[in-house]
Amino acid sequence: MLRFTITDVQEVEPVSYDWGAVKWVSNNEVAPGCEQSFGLVHILPGKTNPLHWHTAAEELVYVLSGECDIKFDDTWYRLTPGRTLYIPPGIKHELKNNGWEPVIYVASFSASMRGTIFDDPDAVGVRPLTASLY
């Protein structure tokens, strides 16, 4: 039975994409039995985490550094350090870094298996749907 897990983000290997990377510090792979997922997301300048949604989890985003824009429907909103964003399951969104420095934010999900679906599965930087954790 799992009692607790301590993870050092400095020791976590990033999952790399064309747009940046994610360091998953807690999920059911890191801590078997964990029912949530928690990661540190890095979006490179000029790059976009493409349009996607999560069928099985709520998402909380907390921006640590940099600035990015997030799109819901046809409207863009600015995220800056210190802002927190709540995204219900099933809401399509994409994040774009229009700045000159990387954007770093914490992403917390209410489920370890998020059920992520991309609008364009052939978009650059998208992992295949067979991937179990994204």
How should each PLM-predicted stretch be described?
Residues A56, W100-E101:
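Short strand-connecting beta-turns/loops that link adjacent beta-strands
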Residues E67-D69, W76, K92, P102:
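Structural motif
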Residues M1-Q36, T116-Y134:
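A short, N-terminal "cap"/entry segment at the start of jelly-roll beta-barrel domains
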Residues D74-P89:
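Short acidic-glycine-tyrosine-enriched beta hairpin
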Residues W24, G39-H54:
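Conserved short histidine dyad/triad with adjacent acidic residue
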Residues P50-H52, I70-K71, I87, H93-G99:
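Short beta-strand His + acidic residue motifs that chelate non-heme Fe in jelly-roll/DSBH
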Residues A56-E58, Y62-C68:
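Glycine- and acidic-residue-biased ligand/ion/polar-headgroup-sensing regions
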Residues L40-V41, Y86, E101-T116:
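A short hydrophobic beta-strand segment most commonly corresponding to one strand
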